[in-house]
C-alpha cells in the first residue's frame, strides 16, 4: 500500500456551513480509520485548510474517497489536492 497526502481549502464560514453534514462526515472518517485507509485528517488552526494522510492502493482510490465525501459534495472543501507521499521517518 502507498501513502498519500491530502491538502485542501475550506469554504468561508466553514465552521457554520459544515454543521448539517458534520455527523455524516465524521462517521465516514471513523470507518475509513478503522479500515486502515485513513491515517489522519483535520483542519489547520483557523479552519482554512485541511490536511490528511491516507494509505491506499492508488492515487485514484484516494481521489474517489474525496469525491464521495459530503464535505466535497456540499462545497465545504473548495479545493483538494492529493499527492503520493514517501515517508522518510
Residues of each region from the PLM?
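Conserved, structured core segments of small domains
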Residues: 1-89
Amino acid at each position: 500500500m502507498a501513502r498519500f497526502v491530502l491538502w485542501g481549502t475550506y469554504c468561508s464560514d466553514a465552521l457554520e456551513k459544515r454543521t448539517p453534514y458534520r455527523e455524516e462526515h465524521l462517521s465516514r472518517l471513523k470507518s475509513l480509520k478503522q479500515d486502515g485507509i485513513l491515517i489522519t485528517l483535520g483542519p489547520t488552526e483557523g479552519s482554512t485548510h485541511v490536511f490528511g494522510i491516507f494509505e491506499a492502493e492508488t492515487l485514484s482510490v484516494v481521489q474517489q474517497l474525496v469525491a464521495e465525501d459530503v464535505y466535497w459534495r456540499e462545497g465545504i472543501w473548495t479545493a483538494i489536492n492529493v499527492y503520493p507521499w514517501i515517508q522518510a521517518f
